């Protein structure tokens, strides 16, 4: 079993699955002149049907939880858009075994008028994907106190 697990940006996909199947896809990509094929060190076949058991476990766990009305919209990257409150448990349950539509999510945000994105966490990988999707987006990265202060100043126009 192998499937596309992440649609990052134009020209970049991530596949995941059983090790041998992933190796076969890697070989096929290279044979068909893929510009670059990189093996990622992950701890599991995330966002694939191989995580169905984890998805079912989440479903059972969520039956014990109370979900409240969202105060701000959340774009679920399994769908690439917002959802209704009552769908949250089902979407979260499916998220572990469904592909991530990062590019679709960013394009949806742009269609909603978003022109600034702040990446929080180490590195600038997601910002690089956003640049490949739409170079007009203003990007900031926060990974420590210094970059937080710099971003706050920039957003205040200082």
Model-derived regions: residue spans:
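Alpha/beta catalytic cores of group-transfer enzymes, especially the acyltransferase/condensing modules
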Residues: 1-90, 94-98, 155
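Acyltransferase/transacylase module recognition
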Residues: 66-158
